[in-house]
Amino acid sequence: MIRIAPRVGLAAAAVAALGLTRNSSDRIPTSDTSVGRLAGPSANAAALSRATADSADTVTQVSMRKVNFYIIPRAALRIRTLRGQMRSFKGGPVTFDDKNAFVIHLDYAEIGLNGNDITALMNSYIFAYPGAPLKHLRVHTSGSQVVQSGVMHKIVDIPFEIRADVSVTPEGLIKLHPVRTRIFGVNGNDLMRAFHLSLQKILDLSKAKGVTVKGNDLFLDPVRILPPPAIEGHATAIRVDGDELVQTFGTVDALPPLTPPDTSSGAYMFYRGGTLHFGKLLMLDAQMQIVDLRPSGFFDFSLDRYKEQLVAGYSRTLPDLGLQVYMLGLDKLSSAGKVSADHLSCSRSTGASQCDPTSSIGTTPASAWPKNYHVTRISPIY
């Protein structure tokens, strides 16, 4: 007979109740190259695809440095470095206006997620479905470990906290191995052993996006846990760095370096080759570098709001007909005020150089600009 002290009676009863319903066994997925359900391009993008069907180069090379790439309003991929390729699912242009229509392949990347990013992903995407077994989740780092707390729901709601070691499997999955579990504030490991339970028997994760369980270990597919745009890549390492969980994909020498026109910018996105489509613009044999209009460390960017960022900035054409785009960082949009629908771009009357990219062109009245600047009115591109 198992003796249970009165102080753990509530926790024991809850854990025992969890054992009444057992889900079918979960299997750890092997290397999975799928990127979820693929949505076809819009009718407009399809027409553009036909128009460029004769082009043999449908892949766009991409390089990023120090970019906070927002995938949902409260979660970003903290891209330290990225070298990869982009392509449309249907061939033809990569269309920025349809993030379901293209994929980013990571040949090499170092990408961080902080506790707030993971928390938002867990609650707003991974477990955002009716009847999810986990809710009200919070995640943070502690030393070299990850701490997750929240509510486990089966028959009753059970508050829990799990402290876990983190590693990468040969298949490229993120493995969370619990080293301490608290249920109702008491030792959850002892309770689960007493009732011959495991997380695999307790949690039905069949509807969760990119998460599986085996025994007491949780496995996260680092690309399937993310909303669009789709990402392909094989995680090769993971570490805790301050408040971030930093993932390494691929190998640093997988592709040759891709050097942007402006090497002085520490934070940028650079696209080269293939065909890019955004707003009303179609760029063949693309060469476009995007930098922060007011640089201050990492560049905050969102596909969902890139038009606002673009309209608040300006662009210039380079001598080789490439495009240099100065966007206002997402974090600065709220402080920029309402942006007029009639915007200004400028170039020096001599044509020798362009506007200072560190100035606030998008919000500064033309009357305040230096006299040696030539002012041209342009309309938004969308």
Model segments located where?
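Bacterial Sec-dependent signal peptides at the C-terminal "C-region" and cleavage site
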Residues: 15-30, 45
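Extracellular/lumenal and peripheral-membrane lipid-interaction modules
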Residues: 29-382
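Hydrophobic alpha-helical targeting segments used for export or membrane insertion
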Residues: 10-18, 37
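Bacterial N-terminal signal peptides that target proteins for export
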Residues: 1-9
